[in-house]
């Protein structure tokens, strides 16, 4: 048995024998099981059952489904932006950083969002939709793309803040941890988008609490913005890997490490 297999077996044992009630802990462990490469049977055993826990206004499954939807939208937008960059269709006039640096930032964020999506769906999260509509201008103008990214990541960070709060209320410490880890990354994306526009990267001492009641508030916002209308299809992991591997520095990781919690 390899070292990875030994570690996975040990983690699997911990997941299945925690002092917490088995049912509640497995809800919280589902993402860990999938994200760390544990055998599919264990991930399946840790699947969410769709029940609402005391103190939570939404089910864990609902929250994770919303998160997967947001990540799918982000991957779709960034993948198509990368395609446009490769084809020389993006006007970069007015950006405050060198173009190669901006390209590396876009590639890194694409990698991270796909990693988030894989992590969530590997544990059973199901996106509400997988086809999205974005303002056409973001695929041809770097400044407009950065403005859109800044806004979108503010919504993402706030949604993960709400998820963190709900999971904490439900006693799901692991899911609260993962929500924080992903949400913190989304906030760095917002800062990078602002820096590339020549703005103060982080202009707030605290992440905005946009959704004080439910994570579902993010769905309403994206619906109002028209993002959830059918349009561009989520490209899938293979296409994301291919565009990262076959262009720019030919690095499928895009320089990103710690690709699971």
Question: Model segments located where?
Answer:
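All-alpha RGS (Regulator of G-protein Signaling) helical domain and cognate RGS-like helical scaffolds
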Residues: 2-20, 27-261
């Amino acid at each position: 048995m390899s070292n990875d297999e030994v570690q996975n077996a040990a983690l699997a044992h911990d997941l299945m024998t925690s002092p917490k009630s088995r049912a509640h802990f497995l809800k919280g462990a589902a993402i860990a099981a999938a994200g760390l490469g544990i055998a599919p049977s264990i991930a399946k055993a840790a699947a969410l059952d769709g029940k609402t826990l005391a103190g939570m206004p939404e089910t864990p499954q609902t929250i994770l489904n919303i998160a997967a939807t947001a990540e799918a939208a982000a991957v779709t937008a960034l993948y198509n932006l990368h395609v446009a960059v490769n084809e020389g269709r993006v006007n970069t006039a007015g950006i405050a950083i060198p173009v190669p640096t901006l390209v590396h930032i876009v590639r890194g964020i694409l990698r991270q969002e796909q990693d988030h999506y894989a992590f969530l769906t590997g544990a059973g999260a199901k996106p509400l939709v997988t086809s999205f509509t974005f303002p056409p201008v973001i695929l041809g103008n770097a400044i407009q793309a950065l403005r859109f990214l800044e806004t979108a990541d503010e919504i993402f960070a706030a949604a993960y803040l709400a998820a963190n709060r709900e999971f904490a209320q439900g006693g799901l410490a692991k899911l609260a941890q993962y929500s924080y880890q992903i949400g913190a990354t989304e906030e760095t994306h917002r800062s990078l988008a602002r820096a590339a526009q020549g703005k103060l990267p982080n202009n707030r001492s605290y992440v905005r609490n946009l959704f004080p009641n439910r994570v579902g508030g993010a769905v309403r916002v994206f619906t109002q913005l028209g993002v959830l209308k059918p349009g561009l299809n989520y490209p899938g992991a293979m296409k994301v890997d291919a565009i990262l591997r076959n262009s720019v520095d030919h690095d499928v990781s895009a320089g990103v490490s710690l690709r699971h919690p």
